[in-house]
């Protein structure tokens, strides 16, 4: 809807400042998918499921603890086999959503973990244990017995376990005597050719409404020999499942994330981790064979061999320093991987999340230092499963990891102990003072006109998520003593929009929304993110092979014979590129622009879609985008040289008559771009 334009002078002629509507589709959201994994309480998990490993004798023989250790050291390994069992609710999904989940999302997520993890080979069938009415049970000859009777139905999450998957009901009387098999039950056929049974439902439960949760999962039964989770459940929230192509990878990553909570990455499983010899990392009670119970959390308490508290002294915050206590995962492979990743040999382990409450804290990696690792507590952009996460799964004692399945994690890589062990305020302040880059953090307050940047991997157009909060942040999360264009004394209101990252501001992908519906995203890879032609002022080209390039400091401009439009949203864009003749070539419209040296300003002047587009793109270092390709060819980027003369580049012109030139007006596109933390959830 057009507004009456005010007048302003421009040279010798009056030009119209026409606000061509505040476009609702330009509403910008920095997206965060929050996980609030609801770990099962100790009494909700069924223990003692009997399995037999392929190279062991009868599982019932001998001392179970000693037997486990011996098996652990010699066991053969095979790829993890996950059996999916659908609840009837899955079949009630809308056809498009069912096909997406059944044909793409679940198969890809399951296949990933089947290729990434190996387990000890088993033989025979798996029969799950029946649940008891009482939390008190007796264990006789390695079998779990209920008091007097078993529950009529055994649930795993929202799904009823089929009778065919269940063992007989074993009971004792209240004093632990007269132990027997309930004659009214029969053993089911059991589960063959599987190491983990995953029951899947699709119900719009109350948990689905918490933060627009997409899915949640947990384990429900553990085996007797090594305590490995052997059955679990996942619920998919129908109303939160998106079928948009540009959201598919995030949806798949969300389901992978949830599966991993059920397989081992859970606060309710840490106490059951074992070392390479199969010995428990956490001491066990003699009477139950289980770790001690944390009465407050209602989970089994791990030892310092798994998670240890570390005090960070002199943690820099606004106006001074505080002591910060962090929980560190300190298992051997995790320590080795985080030290190698950050290039910090004194790092004690991998920091766990300390915010978000029960379900987020301790059961995810710390967002501040492992931002887009998929097992942090919120997905904000390009989630990856790194070697650090695979190392944790291997350190559980239940799996061997195939590290070739890990995706490189660039966040924080090689940045040293100053990044991994100190506050983001320290990092920003130290590097600012020395004229160095403060990436991956940033200090540009989001304000109009909106100026975008590129993520460090150049995969997305992005924004600095530094915003003014409604209330002053807690002292421990105030990360600035001063900020450009912010009044003294108000710095405590400013911080990153992602609370789990300790409000440290960083460059983040975003989405354009219309009436809270995603129109397009900012990831360069997806063709669906291309702007409509009439909105493509910077001639961007999204799709496979596209990368993000910075614009110059000047706004892009569109001209016709009658009007000039300047877009007050600029800073970066997605473009295709080529690598040849030792040079990076950026493709804009139908033209190719050669980069002769880093920081070169490529002036663009191209007629397209009825407008003359004018702007500039900055050349990155050639090796960033072409180095690997040239190296594979036995070549390399050529040294910098003088750029070609301007007349070597295309410079389109308008063909206008004299009359039309005099009547030209200017329209400034002043779309109000609101950055807000719309929280999508996965749990």
Curated annotation (Swiss-Prot):
Disulfide topology = none
> What is written in the cofactor note of this entry?
Binds 1 zinc ion per subunit.
The record's keywords, sorted A to Z, are: Cell cycle, Cell division, Cytoplasm, Hydrolase, Metal-binding, Metalloprotease, Mitosis, Protease, Zinc
Q: Does the keyword Cell wall biogenesis/degradation apply?
A: no
The identity of this protein, by name, is Leishmanolysin-like peptidase
Summarizing the function annotation, the protein's role is: Essential for the coordination of mitotic progression, and also plays a role in cell migration.
Q: Which gene encodes it?
A: Invadolysin
Give its localization: Cytoplasm
The UniProt entry, under Gene3D superfamilies, shows:
3.10.170.20, Leishmanolysin , domain 2, Leishmanolysin domain 3
- This enzyme's EC code(s): 3.4.24.-
């Amino acid at each position: 809807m057009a507004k009456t334009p005010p007048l302003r002078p421009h040279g010798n002629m009056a030009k119209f400042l026409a606000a061509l509507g505040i476009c609702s589709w330009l509403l910008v959201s920095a997206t965060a998918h929050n996980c609030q994994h609801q770990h099962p309480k100790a009494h909700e998990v069924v223990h003692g499921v009997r399995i037999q490993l392929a190279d062991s004798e009868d599982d019932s023989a001998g001392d179970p603890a000693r037997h486990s250790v011996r098996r652990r050291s010699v066991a053969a390994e095979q790829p993890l086999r996950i059996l999916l069992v659908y609840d009837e609710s899955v079949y009630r999904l809308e056809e498009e959503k069912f096909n997406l989940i059944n044909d793409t999302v679940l198969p890809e997520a399951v296949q990933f973990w089947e290729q990434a993890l190996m387990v000890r080979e088993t033989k025979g069938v798996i029969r799950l244990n029946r649940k008891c009415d009482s939390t008190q049970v007796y264990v006789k000859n390695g079998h779990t017995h209920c008091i007097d009777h078993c529950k009529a139905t055994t649930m795993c999450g929202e799904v009823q376990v089929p009778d065919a998957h269940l063992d007989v009901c074993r009971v004792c009387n209240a004093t632990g005597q007269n132990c027997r098999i309930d004659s009214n039950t029969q053993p089911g056929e059991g589960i063959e050719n599987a190491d983990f049974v995953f029951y899947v439902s699709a119900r719009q439960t109350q948990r689905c409404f918490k933060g627009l949760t997409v899915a949640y999962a947990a384990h429900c039964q553990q085996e007797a020999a090594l305590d490995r989770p052997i059955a679990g459940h996942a619920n998919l929230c129908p109303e939160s499942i998106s079928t948009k192509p540009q959201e598919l990878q995030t949806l798949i990553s969300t389901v992978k994330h949830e599966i991993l909570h059920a397989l081992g990455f859970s606060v309710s499983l840490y106490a059951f981790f074992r070392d390479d010899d199969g010995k428990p990392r956490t001491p066990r009670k003699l009477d139950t064979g289980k770790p001690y119970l944390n009465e407050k959390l209602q989970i089994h308490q791990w030892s310092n061999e798994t998670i240890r508290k570390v005090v960070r002294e002199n943690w820099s915050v606004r106006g001074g320093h505080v002591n910060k206590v962090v929980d560190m995962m300190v298992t051997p492979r995790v320590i080795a991987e985080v030290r190698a990743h950050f290039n910090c040999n004194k790092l004690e382990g991998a920091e766990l999340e300390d915010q978000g409450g029960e379900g987020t804290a301790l059961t995810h990696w710390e967002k501040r230092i492992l931002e887009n690792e998929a097992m942090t507590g919120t997905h904000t952009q390009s989630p990856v499963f790194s070697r650090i996460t695979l190392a944790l799964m291997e350190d559980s004692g239940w799996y061997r990891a195939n590290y070739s399945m890990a995706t490189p994690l660039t966040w924080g890589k090689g940045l040293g102990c100053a990044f991994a062990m100190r506050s983001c305020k320290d990092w920003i302040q130290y590097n600012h003072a020395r004229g160095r880059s403060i990436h991956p953090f940033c200090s540009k307050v989001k304000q109009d006109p909106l100026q975008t940047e590129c993520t460090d991997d150049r995969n997305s157009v992005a924004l600095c998520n530094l915003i003014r909060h409604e209330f002053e942040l807690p002292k421990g999360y105030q990360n600035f003593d001063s900020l450009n264009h912010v009044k003294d004394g108000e710095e405590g209101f400013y911080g990153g929009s992602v609370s789990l990252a300790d409000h440290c501001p960083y460059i983040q992908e975003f989405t354009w929304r219309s009436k809270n519906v995603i129109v397009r995203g900012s990831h360069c890879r997806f063709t669906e993110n291309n702007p409509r032609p009439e909105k493509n002022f910077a001639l961007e080209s999204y799709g496979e092979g596209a990368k993000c390039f910075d614009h110059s400091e000047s706004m892009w401009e569109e001209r016709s014979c009658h009007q000039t439009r300047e877009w007050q949203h600029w800073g970066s864009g997605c473009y295709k590129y080529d690598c040849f003749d030792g040079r990076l070539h950026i493709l804009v419209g139908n033209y190719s622009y050669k980069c002769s040296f880093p920081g070169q300003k490529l002036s663009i002047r191209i007629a397209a879609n009825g407008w003359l587009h004018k702007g500039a793109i900055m050349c990155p270092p050639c090796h960033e985008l072409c180095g690997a390709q040239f190296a594979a060819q036995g070549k390399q980027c050529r040294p910098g040289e003088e750029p070609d003369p301007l007349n070597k580049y295309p410079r389109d012109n308008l063909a206008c008559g004299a009359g039309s030139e005099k009547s030209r007006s200017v329209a400034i596109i002043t779309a109000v771009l609101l950055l807000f933390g719309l929280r999508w959830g996965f749990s």
